[in-house]
């Protein structure tokens, strides 16, 4: 009996654990502090800084089953998903890693043992082929002489992509970053399937399938293409779980493995589909995996960056559901079956199931409102098409008006053998994309990519000032030996009391100084294991090796500490008041305010906001001790400690507890006791994305300032109403009631005046071929009264055509009324359109009543004068 996908995943991890590897949990699909990546797309992403020598772990061997998404940027598989046997937006990458420990020999031997040993995967040795980089003689000899693979099944692959190192067997994560030669292992499905070995003209067939890529990490590729040797040669391997499952379960398509068969059946059930071979089922089964896990990792549908990629995938799935005949929202119903089939890999998703389902349901409902109209428009345009390409302007209109991502439009067109002018689409979107780029958080400044080989010791928990030594200086991202007065720079010290931005808490400000210089620190950031002090040298000069006194801005740090501790209390309070589905989606803690984004599907009610405030202030009054303990990550999680969204943790973590009320993993700075916070007040609650709410709050002196401001406003209002704060509500109700009464009386007077004006106007009507025509410009009449006047005049005049106009604040308001017995010859909409066009406006309406506006008041007399001739021509 073949292994299930879940069993294969576990067997891989167990094998490498038996070889001394640390089993490391999958990292988030949102890369941590890596502006070069849209999504985690390989197992090694979370170890990138380790390969670069910027981060250190307490293990030198690791193994993971990493969740990955490839649907945007360089690694974009979206258009092929559902149409091929092996393309996915979401997949799991099984991997083993060596950080300066073993290298080529052991990496190859481990792979061969796992694949061929009867105890593990037991694949037939004669079915396995390998490739090596053309010049990698060492790997070739290991495969031939130690493993024993015949020469005819070992293939050298050179630079086959038109540039040095551009090869299927020279791996690189992106345009920059860790890279090196690799050896790939292929499985031969047999001669009953078309295809040839790698490197042959028939290599794109499905007979020989790559199942494992073993990268020998030796270089760090720079932006200019140069290769810098990594500190220690390392190993990075990747084996797609879905691919190896297909091999071990004796099927040729990933969509035929147990995991996808189960999901496809679930899709068929919720959509009502009966043909299980329909490719739309495969598309949806794939897309629920990427969408659910992206949302669980904090990505929300939007029109920018990661959120837009998520929206594209959701809408593609919804459109395929529509093709299958789904009559109601269905996509969110697949989260439960997905959790079941993912086994232990779905535990994080299960904790957020309700939140993920709600986000998917809301997004599907929003798109469903425009999907049918958009598809109808696309059908119309395709029916009119004379060539084989849909113009970019139409594709953009579908995106802008109906929310159709261009790849969804391309999907529909491809089914009819029609191409989309994507260049034209991009041109139409250029201005919007420019604005999106300006608003985007992607693309870090030059400081973000600084490489610092040294480490800094943070001593800011216990000290706000201490002496340190300059170990590195950077100007414009480049290392320098010295800086002079007036220069902006990043200063790295061997030890520092300055807190570097992390976990939502901003970096410290302060001063680095001695008798000969003063450096104003405006921000503090992490660079690998180093802490960089960002600022400007105000006076003197500074060089590497100098001793400095580092002084943190104590008052600012104190305010930050209060806000950070209050954030923890508020997080716990939100979970008590709203439910345990609340999880942190982002935060900002500075010296003025705390901002907290969290998962919740609706605006908080006033009583809920008050309950959270009261609960936090109750903990402040309890004056609970705020304690920190260092412990193993797993022990901390077992204790119930909550982890912060988007943060990466070491195996040993800092656990912050506030009595029995709050326990979280946190490396930030905090008050000593909750009583230090003094007072907590929520100043705003709003939505930031589907299923995400944001609270801003203040503490201590900031909270007291808001209390005083509220009191001052109440006093001012009481003074204006000639009352006092004790009876202010009664006073306001009285004023509002009096205002309503006066507005009612005023409206009655306006209606009486309009009726009188209508009576006066009726005598000015002229006869045109048996129909009374009345055209008039009125002064001092509100635009909204024109309709009432037209109704009155139609009742008085019988068979009639009426055009009234008024000008207010330079804007023209027009209305046309036509009695129903005349609408077969004169339509109010056409008449008003003719007049509006002459005054720089447009409008429309029913055949018997239409309204319009305009901007050219000077042209109004001539426009009204043209009505008689236009009507006469229509009535002949």
Swiss-Prot record:
Record GO terms (molecular function): alanine-tRNA ligase activity; aminoacyl-tRNA deacylase activity; ATP binding; tRNA binding; zinc ion binding
GO cellular component, one term: cytosol
Catalytic activity: tRNA(Ala) + L-alanine + ATP = L-alanyl-tRNA(Ala) + AMP + diphosphate
Residues that bind Zn(2+): 564, 568, 666, 670
GO BP annotations, alphabetical order: alanyl-tRNA aminoacylation; negative regulation of DNA-templated transcription
Function: Catalyzes the attachment of alanine to tRNA(Ala) in a two-step reaction: alanine is first activated by ATP to form Ala-AMP and then transferred to the acceptor end of tRNA(Ala). Also edits incorrectly charged Ser-tRNA(Ala) and Gly-tRNA(Ala) via its editing domain.
Subunit structure, interactors included: Homotetramer.
Protein's name in the database: Alanine--tRNA ligase
Organism: Shigella boydii serotype 4 (strain Sb227)
Gene transcribed to yield this protein: alaS
């Amino acid at each position: 009996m073949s292994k299930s996908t879940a069993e294969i995943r576990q067997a891989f991890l167990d094998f490498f654990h038996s070889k001394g590897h640390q089993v490391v949990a999958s990292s988030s699909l949102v890369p941590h502090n890596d502006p070069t990546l849209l999504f985690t797309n390989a197992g090694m992403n979370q170890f990138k800084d380790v390969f670069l020598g910027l981060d250190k772990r307490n293990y030198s061997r690791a193994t993971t089953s990493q969740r990955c998404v490839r649907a945007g940027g360089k690694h974009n598989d979206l258009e092929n998903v559902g149409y091929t046997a092996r393309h996915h937006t979401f997949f799991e990458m099984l991997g083993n890693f060596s950080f300066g420990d073993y290298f080529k020999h052991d990496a190859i031997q481990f792979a061969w043992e796992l694949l061929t040993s009867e105890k593990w995967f037991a694949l037939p040795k004669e079915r396995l082929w390998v490739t090596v980089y053309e010049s990698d003689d060492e790997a070739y000899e290991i495969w031939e002489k130690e493993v024993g693979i015949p020469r005819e099944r070992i293939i050298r692959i050179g630079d086959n992509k038109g540039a040095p190192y551009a090869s299927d067997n020279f791996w690189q994560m992106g345009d920059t970053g860790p890279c090196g030669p690799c050896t790939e292992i292929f499985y031969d499905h047999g001669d009953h399937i078309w295809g040839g070995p790698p490197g042959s003209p028939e290599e794109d067939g499905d007979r020989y399938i790559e199942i494992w890529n073993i990268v020998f990490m030796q270089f760090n590729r720079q932006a200019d293409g140069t290769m810098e040797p990594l500190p220690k040669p390392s190993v990075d391997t990747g084996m797609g779980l879905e691919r190896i499952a297909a091999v071990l379960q004796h099927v040729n398509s990933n969509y035929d493995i147990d995991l996808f068969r189960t999901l496809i059946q679930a899709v068929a059930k919720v959509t009502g589909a009966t043909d299980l071979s329909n490719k739309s089922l495969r598309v949806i089964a794939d897309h629920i995996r990427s969408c659910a896990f992206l949302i669980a990792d904090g990505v929300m549908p939007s029109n920018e960056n990661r959120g837009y990629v998520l929206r594209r995938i959701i809408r593609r799935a919804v459109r395929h559901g529509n093709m299958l005949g789904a009559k109601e929202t269905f996509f969110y119903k697949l989260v439960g079956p997905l959790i079941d089939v993912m086994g232990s890999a779905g535990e994080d998703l299960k904790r957020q199931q309700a939140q993920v389902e709600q986000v998917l349901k809301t997004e599907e409902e929003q798109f469903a409102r425009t999907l049918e109209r958009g598809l109808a428009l696309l059908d119309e345009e395709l029916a009119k098409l004379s060539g084989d390409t849909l113009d970019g302007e139409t594709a953009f209109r579908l995106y802008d008006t109906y929310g159709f991502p261009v790849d969804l439009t391309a999907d529909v067109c491809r089914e009819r053998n029609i191409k989309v002018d994507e260049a034209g689409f991009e041109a139409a979107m250029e201005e919007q994309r420019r604005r999106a780029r300006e608003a985007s958080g992607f693309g870090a400044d030059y400081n973000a990519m600084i490489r610092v080989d040294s480490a800094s010791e943070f001593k800011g928990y216990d000290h706000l000032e201490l002496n340190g030594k300059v170990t590195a200086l950077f100007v414009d991202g480049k290392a320098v030996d010295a800086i002079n007065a007036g220069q902006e720079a990043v200063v790295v010290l061997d030890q520092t009391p300055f807190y570097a931005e992390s976990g939502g808490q901003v970096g410290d400000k302060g001063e680095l100084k001695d008798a000969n210089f003063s450096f104003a620190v405006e921000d503090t950031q992490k660079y690998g294991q180093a802490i960089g002090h960002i600022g400007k040298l105000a006076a003197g000069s500074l060089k590497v090796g100098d001793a400095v006194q580092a002084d943190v801005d104590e008052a600012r740090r104190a305010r930050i500490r209060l806000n950070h501790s209050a954030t923890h209390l508020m997080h716990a309070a939100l979970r008590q008041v709203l439910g345990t589905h609340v999880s942190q989606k982002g935060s900002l803690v500075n010296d003025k305010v705390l901002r907290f984004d969290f998962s919740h599907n609706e605006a908080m009610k006033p009583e809920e906001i008050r309950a959270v405030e009261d609960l936090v202030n109750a903990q402040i009054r309890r004056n609970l001790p705020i304690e920190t303990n260092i412990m193993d990550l797993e022990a901390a999680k077992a204790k119930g400690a909550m982890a912060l969204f988007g943060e990466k943790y070491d195996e040993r973590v800092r656990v912050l507890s506030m009595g029995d009320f709050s326990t979280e993993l946190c490396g930030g700075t905090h008050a000593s006791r909750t009583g230090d916070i003094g007072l907590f007040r929520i100043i705003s609650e709003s939505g930031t994305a589907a299923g995400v709410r944001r609270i801003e709050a203040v503490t201590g002196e900031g909270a007291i300032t808001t209390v005083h401001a509220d009191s001052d406003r109440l006093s001012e209002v009481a003074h204006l109403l000639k009352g006092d704060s004790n009876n202010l509500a009664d006073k306001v109700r009285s004023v509002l009631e009096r205002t309503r009464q006066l507005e009612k009386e005023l409206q009655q007077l306006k209606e009486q005046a309009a009726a009188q004006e209508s009576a006066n106007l009726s005598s000015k009507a002229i006869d045109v071929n048996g129909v009374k025509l009345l055209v008039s410009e009125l002064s001092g009449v509100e635009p909204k009264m024109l309709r009432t006047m037209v109704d009155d005049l139609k009742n008085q005049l019988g068979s009639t055509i009426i055009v009234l106009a008024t000008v207010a604040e330079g804007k023209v308001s027009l209305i046309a009324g036509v009695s129903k017995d005349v609408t077969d010859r004169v339509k109010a909409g056409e008449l008003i359109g003719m007049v509006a066009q002459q005054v720089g406006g447009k409008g429309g309406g029913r055949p018997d009543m239409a309204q319009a506006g305009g901007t050219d008041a000077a042209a109004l007399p001539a426009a009204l004068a043209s009505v008689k001739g236009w009507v006469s021509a229509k009535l002949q």
